Regions:
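Radical SAM enzyme [4Fe-4S]-AdoMet core and its adjacent flexible, acidic
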Residues: 2-6, 192, 197-199, 204-334, ...
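Conserved, mostly hydrophobic/aromatic
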Residues: 102, 171, 196, 346, ...
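N-terminal pre-core extensions flanking Radical SAM catalytic domains
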Residues: 1-114, 135, 410-414, 418, ...
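Cys/His-rich metal-chelating microdomains
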Residues: 101, 105, 109-112, 336, ...
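Short, charged low-complexity linear segments at domain edges
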Residues: 72-90, 309-322, 359-380, 385
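Flexible mid-to-C-terminal extensions adjoining Fe-S/redox cofactors in radical SAM and related proteins
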Residues: 347-432
Length: 432
C-alpha cells in the first residue's frame, strides 16, 4: 500500500498519512497540485502551474512531511471517488462494536446495559465487507469496541481483515484478559493500537466504577505489555478522579504506555444513572490545566502528556472548535460529520453516545455509504440551524436539554470563559 491516500472532499481533499494515521486537509487549489503530483514530478508541476510561486510554496511545505518521493512525485494515490457537496466522503473514524458481552458492569459505561440479548453480531465475512467499504470512502481510522472485544473468539481474524483492507484499527479493552501471549500477537500487527481503559491512578477511584479488584488486575497485566505492543492508557475524567490526573500521567509512564488520553465521562448509557460522576466544566478545565503544567513544551497553549513524543487528546470543546471548522460545515460536533458508530448487529449511528434511538439503518439492509449520506439521523444532525446553535457535544445537549438541537452547557461555559478571560483559555492538541 502507498504511504499516502488523497481523499477528495467538498472543500478540496484530505490526505491520509499511513505512517502517522493522520489526516491533513487541503483546499481545492492545493488539491489540484497534489493530484498533479501523483503522476508528475514536482519540478514539472511547478513549471506548468498558472501560479508557480504558490505551487512551489506548497511543494516546500510537503517536503518536511515526507510526502514526496525521491523523484519528486507524491508518495501516494488519489482515491477514485466523487464526494458529496456538503459533507465528507466518509467519516474520519468509525467505531465498530464487535461484541455486546462484557465481563464488567462499569457504572459510567457509555453503552446500554450489557449483555444485550437479541442482537446477532456481525460475522467476520460481514465485517470484512464493511471494512473494505470504509476503505473505499477514505475512512481509514477504525475503533473496535464492545462490550469487551477480547471476549470475541475470532478477534485476531477481525483485526487482520481490517488491516488487509488498509484500515488502521485501534482496539479498546478493559485489559482484564490481556495476556502476554495476546499482547505479543497484537504487537505483530503493526497497524494495531491497543487502547486500555483506566479510570484513576488508584484502586479506590478505579474500582469504584469498574468493580473491586479490577485496578490491580489490569495494572499487573500491563507491566510487560509495553515491551510487546504499543498501547495507550485511556482515562475517563469524573468528579471523583479529576484531582489525580497528575498521578494518572505518572502511572502511564510507570507502566510504559506510549500515549495517555484523557476524556470526560459523557451523560449516556449506564452513566445516566450516575449524574454525580459528571465533572463540571470548571473541574474538567482544572484537570486539563494540571496536565498542561506537566508539559515539556514551552508553548502554554498546548497540553502534552510527557510520554515519549506523544500529545494528549483531550476531547475538550476548544479542541473541537479548533479542528472541526477545517473539514466540516455546521455545528462542529463530530457526530454525523467526522465520526460515526456501527453496533454489534450492524446498526449505523452518528455517535454511539446518542444511544440506540438514533440508529439510522443496518448495513445488512443498506450499504454503509447510503446510510452515511442519507440516513435519517445523519440528515437530522447535519441540518441543525447554525443561527440558533453554537456548537458542542450532541450527546451532552441531548441529556441536558432533551434534544440534539439543544445547546451543550459546556459550550456555553467555554464561550463565557473566553469572553471573561481569553488569556486563560487552554488550547490542546487533538487527534480528530
Amino acid at each position: 500500500m502507498t504511504p499516502l491516500v488523497v481523499v477528495p472532499q467538498f472543500f478540496g481533499s484530505l490526505v491520509f498519512d499511513r505512517a502517522t494515521s493522520r489526516y491533513y486537509p487541503f483546499d481545492r487549489d492545493a488539491t489540484d497540485v497534489l493530484e498533479a503530483l501523483v503522476h508528475t514530478p514536482a519540478s514539472t508541476v511547478v513549471e506548468r502551474h498558472s501560479d508557480p510561486d504558490a505551487a512551489l510554496d506548497l511543494v516546500r511545505r510537503l517536503d518536511p512531511l515526507s510526502f514526496l518521493r525521491p523523484d519528486g512525485r507524491l508518495a501516494g494515490v488519489r482515491l477514485d471517488a466523487v464526494p458529496p457537496d456538503d459533507h465528507l466522503l466518509g467519516p474520519l473514524a468509525v467505531h465498530v462494536e464487535v461484541i455486546a458481552q462484557c465481563n464488567l458492569r462499569c457504572t459510567h459505561c457509555f453503552a446500554d446495559p450489557l449483555p444485550r440479548g437479541g442482537r446477532d453480531a456481525l460475522t467476520l465475512l460481514e465485517l470484512d465487507g464493511l471494512f473494505r467499504e470504509l476503505a473505499s470512502l477514505g475512512s481509514f481510522r477504525l475503533g473496535l469496541t464492545g462490550g469487551e472485544p477480547l471476549l470475541r473468539k475470532d478477534l485476531l481474524d477481525v483485526l487482520d481483515a481490517a488491516t488487509d483492507a488498509g484500515l488502521h484499527p485501534c482496539l479498546t479493552t478493559n485489559g482484564f484478559f490481556l495476556s502476554d501471549e495476546l499482547a505479543r500477537e497484537l504487537g505483530r500487527r503493526d497497524l494495531v493500537w491497543l487502547n486500555v481503559s483506566l479510570d484513576g491512578a488508584t484502586a479506590a477511584t478505579h474500582d469504584a466504577v469498574r468493580g473491586t479488584g479490577t485496578f490491580d488486575t489490569v495494572v499487573e497485566r500491563l507491566r510487560h505489555v509495553g515491551d510487546l505492543a504499543r498501547f495507550t492508557l485511556a482515562f475517563t475524567i469524573t468528579s471523583d478522579n479529576a484531582h489525580e490526573v497528575d498521578r494518572c500521567v505518572s502511572l502511564a509512564e510507570e507502566l510504559g504506555a506510549h500515549t495517555a488520553v484523557f476524556r470526560p465521562v459523557y451523560p449516556t448509557g449506564a452513566a445516566l444513572n450516575r449524574p454525580e460522576l459528571m465533572p463540571t466544566y470548571e473541574t474538567y478545565q482544572r484537570a486539563l490545566r494540571t496536565i498542561a503544567a506537566l508539559s515539556n513544551d514551552d508553548d502554554s497553549s498546548c497540553a502534552h502528556v510527557p510520554l515519549p513524543g506523544r500529545a494528549m487528546d483531550s476531547f475538550s470543546p476548544q479542541a473541537r472548535a479548533r479542528t472541526a471548522g477545517r473539514v466540516v460545515q455546521g455545528d462542529g460536533c463530530g457526530a454525523a460529520n467526522t465520526v460515526c458508530s456501527v453496533s454489534v448487529d450492524g446498526q449505523v449511528n452518528p455517535c454511539s453516545f446518542l444511544g440506540s434511538r438514533f440508529e439510522s439503518a443496518s448495513i445488512r439492509e443498506r450499504s454503509f455509504r447510503e446510510i452515511w449520506n442519507d440516513g435519517w439521523s445523519f440528515r437530522k444532525l447535519r441540518s441543525i440551524d447554525s443561527e440558533s446553535f453554537r456548537g458542542g457535544c450532541r450527546a451532552r445537549a441531548l441529556a441536558s436539554g432533551g434534544s440534539v438541537h439543544a445547546r451543550d452547557p459546556w459550550e456555553r461555559e467555554w464561550r463565557r470563559s473566553r469572553m471573561e478571560s481569553p488569556s486563560r483559555t487552554l488550547e490542546v492538541l487533538i487527534d480528530d
